[in-house]
Amino acid sequence: MGTAAAASISNHFLKRKDSVSLVTYGDKLDFLPADTGDKQHYKILSRLASVAAGGSMPLQAVTNSLAPRISRGSPVFIISSLEGDGTTLPAIRNLSGNGHEVIVLSPSSIDLERLVSRIPRMSYEVLKLERQNRLTAVSGYGAKVIDWMPEVELSQALLGSRGT
């Protein structure tokens, strides 16, 4: 879900002739500097094709190391379920505080899991409430949060977020 979203979002901005960079991380950081055009689109797709889920690098370590490379005021898209990383809130607060428009696209792993297996209703409700609390906290730090349900197409999730 996340790699397809990153490809779609980067393609949108490249078609507008905007510069786009890509950062992926897990156990290590992979940074593709900002550029424009078809060649950049190919580079982004190549990098995304080799991305694997997992790793233990905290988001704040990533944002701290990249802060000097991000132009002030540039929009920053974060695609993350927001689970298991206690540094997410400080990282988003720092990005927002440095003048960046932070957009968090958060695929709901809870709803995805519910689609493929049977989670007891009470467990699902508790996990859903915890997720909503995380999204609200992230929003409170200045980020625009898009709660992306697995049964909803990306374009619809993005369009639905315009009014919020």
Where are the predicted features?
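Exposed, interaction-prone extracellular/peripheral surfaces
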Residues: M1-T164
